[in-house]
Amino acid sequence: MRCCLKAFRDSVTRSVKIYGLYISIYIIHSQILRNSCHAPEYGKNGILVMGDVAVTPVPDPNQLAQIAVCTAQTAKAVAGIENPKVAMLSFSTKGSAKHEVVDKVVEATKIAKEMAPTLDLDGEMQADAALVPEVGASKAPGSPVAGEANVLIVPSLEVGNISYKLVQRLGHADAIGPILQGIARPVNDLSRGCSIEDVYRKIGRAHV
């Protein structure tokens, strides 16, 4: 099922009514693949996976942890990232700032590590610490993810949606998504602002 003629919320609501949810996943989330040809040094040859950018406005720690683990699985299955390195993003790196929203990311990181103990996942960390090796080494020494992240987990939908659209438009990145997870059948959605190229890329990913 593919949707792009109405608001994303309507597409998700109808998809859930028609197909239902996987029993093991109590929340739907989505992520976007960004093939950034202008910045191949980031992610895996310029490919980054981000979640959640379209569904859950303010995830709690448990929801954020599940988003992280499932997004890593999608990075491996769909984006060809054999070794996902998941960064739990915040405006703080390893306790550099104190706030309740930072605490949420810290708690989500702990839960995600318990859910997937073999997954390379770390946080909380700022985006530059996650992506730039020199910054990561300075701000989060010893982290298995800092400076090498290819999966970015944002703390809220507001952050994710704004971030990916800025990167897409200002950074000239190819946005492929959102890729929905948690629905019992494959469902894909496209922004009403998408281009013909976006449609072609999404069709290709839908058949992976």
Task: Annotate the PLM regions.
Residues 1-146, 150-207:
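Anion-binding alpha/beta catalytic cores of soluble intermediary-metabolism enzymes, centered on
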